[in-house]
Amino acid sequence: MRHVLPIIVLLLAAPGCHRGVRFENQVLTKSGVSYRVGEVSPGWERVMLSSNDLAWFIEDTGHALQVNATCKGHDDPPLDVLVRHLLMGFTERQLVEEQKVVVDERDALRSHYRAKLDGVPVELLLLVVKKDNCVYDFSYVAPLGRFEERVADFEALVHGFHAERTS
């Protein structure tokens, strides 16, 4: 399981760039955008992936969190299309629950799935929101049966989200 779950983090990665990215006081700043996220609890290891703005991983359990903003080249697709993009690479996808929610005063789509990656069962919680010409996506991946253990950290990240600026 340990060798498969880091792949999950990589597959969830939406296009991004770490050059010129700064994360201080829960605010991520990169070219053209700055946004705030909530704080995750102790135990998460922040990992630097060139394809994500922010990512955390718990090696002992295989839980993963990811946040990314895309402000160029996304052609303004609907929220459900953005969720499907995040599901690429996963097979046997089963939608558990999907709901429209409001995040930072914008409509967002929150989707809970069970799926497999390379035959390994996982649970996913995905959230996409569009604001000020940017797409923000949040992902939580948990081993099947361990979803509830760390879902509060995903909720904290999203609850603390605020788009600070775009240019």
Which residues make up each language-model segment?
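Sec-dependent signal peptide hydrophobic core
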Residues: 5-9
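Short aromatic-glycine motifs in intrinsically disordered, low-complexity regions
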Residues: 25-37
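Positively charged n-region of N-terminal signal peptides that target proteins for export
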Residues: 1-3
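Conserved polar/disulfide-associated segments of primarily extracytoplasmic proteins
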Residues: 46-137, 142
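Bacterial signal peptide processing site
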Residues: 18-20
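A general boundary/transition motif marking the beginning of the first structured unit of a protein
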Residues: 32, 70-74, 145, 149
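Surface-exposed amphipathic alpha-helical segments
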Residues: 35-45, 90, 136-167
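C-terminal motif of bacterial Sec signal peptides marking the signal peptidase cleavage site
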Residues: 14-16
